[in-house]
């Protein structure tokens, strides 16, 4: 498959993720859309790496996946804290952390 196709797929996935972040109110769905955007960026890194014949993009994608794994742990802990306090998983309830 042509690397250009991977870049188009990456742009499509990133757009879907960005639309989900902007349009959805459920924290878990927003969180999944952010992860989709990160995976789209990883796909673009790997596609550019393959286009240029170097491993730099693959290394960046690997480290991005490590950071995303840490983000998942922290993000789910925050979501669970909000849900336990408010019994809701809405983005509007995220102001709980201010108090």
From Swiss-Prot:
Stated name of the protein: NADH-quinone oxidoreductase subunit K
EC number: 7.1.1.-
Subunit field text: NDH-1 is composed of 14 different subunits. Subunits NuoA, H, J, K, L, M, N constitute the membrane sector of the complex.
InterPro entries named among the record's database cross-references: NADH_UbQ_OxRdtase_chain4L/K (IPR001133), NUOK/Mnh_C1-like (IPR039428)
One GO term (biological process): ATP synthesis coupled electron transport
Disulfide pairings: none
Biological role: NDH-1 shuttles electrons from NADH, via FMN and iron-sulfur (Fe-S) centers, to quinones in the respiratory chain. The immediate electron acceptor for the enzyme in this species is believed to be a menaquinone. Couples the redox reaction to proton translocation (for every two electrons transferred, four hydrogen ions are translocated across the cytoplasmic membrane), and thus conserves the redox energy in a proton gradient.
Catalytic activity: a quinone + NADH + 5 H(+)(in) = a quinol + NAD(+) + 4 H(+)(out)
One MF annotation (Gene Ontology) recorded for this entry: NADH:ubiquinone reductase (non-electrogenic) activity
Keyword NAD: yes
Pfam families: Oxidored_q2 (PF00420)
PANTHER family with a match to the protein in the record: NADH DEHYDROGENASE SUBUNIT 4L-RELATED (PTHR11434:SF21), NADH-UBIQUINONE OXIDOREDUCTASE SUBUNIT ND4L (PTHR11434)
Name of the gene: nuoK
Ranges that cross the membrane: 3-23, 28-48, 59-79
Subcellular location: Cell membrane
GO cellular component: NADH dehydrogenase complex; plasma membrane
Gene3D superfamilies: 1.10.287.3510
Keywords linked to the UniProt accession: Cell membrane, Membrane, NAD, Quinone, Translocase, Transmembrane, Transmembrane helix, Transport
Topology in membrane: Multi-pass membrane protein
Similarity remark: Belongs to the complex I subunit 4L family.
């Amino acid at each position: 498959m042509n690397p250009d196709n991977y870049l188009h797929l990456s742009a499509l996935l990133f757009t879907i993720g960005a639309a989900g972040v902007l349009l959805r109110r459920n924290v878990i769905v927003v969180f999944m859309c952010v992860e989709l955007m990160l995976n789209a960026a990883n796909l673009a890194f790997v596609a550019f790496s393959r286009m240029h014949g170097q491993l730099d993009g693959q290394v960046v994608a690997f480290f991005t996946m490590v950071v995303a794994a840490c983000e998942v742990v922290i993000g789910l802990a925050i979501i669970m804290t909000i849900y336990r306090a408010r019994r809701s998983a809405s983005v509007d309830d995220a102001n709980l952390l201010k108090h």
